[in-house]
Amino acid sequence: MTRTKQFLTSSVATIASCAAALLMLMPLGAKAQSASASDDGEVDRTPHIHGTLRCKYEYQTSEGEGRFEVRNARVSVDGKVTPFISYKAEIDLCDEGSIKMLDAYTRLKPIQPLAFTVGQMRVPFTIDAHRSPHQQYFANRSFIAKQVGNVRDVGAAVAYNMNVGFPVVLEAGLFNGSGLTGQKDYWTKSVNFSAKAQLFFPRGFNLTLSMQKIRPDHTGVMMYDAGAYWHAQGWHVEGEYLYKHYSNNAFHDVHAFDAFISRDIRTGSKALKFVTPLVRYDYMSDHSDGSRYLDGKKSAEGSLIVNDYKRSRLTGGLTFSFAKPFISDIRLNYEKYFYRSGAIAKPSERDKIVLEVMTRF
């Protein structure tokens, strides 16, 4: 009974703190415009259908082995039912061979700068992990986006947009902590949350700060992320650092970093619009997914283990865009891995050449 009371008290306090912070900041933003139109207010209820197809060929240079893969076959439906209520549902028909429900949420905008989202979504955390597949610069994601900070969950989030001389976006939410599966019988006494602030400075500069608490198993995990980028005149320069801490010293702290630079070059051709050379460096220390293992299987009798060994990677390549970038791209990359002594490289995480065709519709 005491634990239940503590959980409820903690939950209410967290929600109240987020709400109070947003209410205090509201006067700084642009003047709110009410979206409370009448039931007969005009709104286009036509659903919008979008999708992303990513097909690629990878060749591992050391092993002399190659494979074709459909990495993503995503389809999404979104739209509005009233001037201030919208929705989105997204499914991946082939996420490395598996079918996954990704987004399923309703969004309410009672006033223009404020939005509430309830359902399953990508939590507000990091820069690179928050990118959709068609928005990625490289064929394979960074270590931050793939191993360390990639989280979708079920919960409720609030976002507030304001202008303090430059645009600022604040987001915060409470989530199950269960991930995409196991919702039906998942009950928790812990509070899992995420918060993110994006500052869009003049001349294409951005600073993003975020934090997140999850509890994949019996161990609480806190993550802190700081990233910045400059996007202007065809250039994109970005750097991001993530720090991950496990409670009760269940596993040593994890550090992850990535930095890259790209340059869109117009070709003047009617078919091939842009050629983009780009290069990336990313790094991660030994990493645990937060679950206990015994004899290679998840078990409450086990302990946290190294799921991803310490490594760094250098990636270089070219992207060929047949429309504006991130619509119809061919990505050609070479990845060079550097593992620590004694590390075991997974089959798909070795030196390789990647040729990917991405189509967004």
Can you say where each PLM-predicted feature lies in the sequence?
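N-terminal periplasmic/intermembrane-space "pro-region" immediately following the signal or transit peptide
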Residues: 2-7, 25-54, 361
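Compositionally biased, intrinsically disordered low-complexity segments enriched
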Residues: 5-8, 35, 122, 200, ...
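Sec-dependent signal peptide recognition
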Residues: 5-9, 13-17
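Bacterial N-terminal signal peptides
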Residues: 14-27
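Short, solvent-exposed coil/turn segments
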Residues: 31, 70, 99, 151, ...
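Outer membrane beta-barrel
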Residues: 37-179, 189-191, 197-206, 260-262, ...
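Outer-membrane beta-barrel pore domains
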Residues: 61-63, 82, 107-109, 129-131, ...
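Active-site cleft segment of glycoside hydrolase catalytic domains centered on the general acid/base Glu
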Residues: 183-187
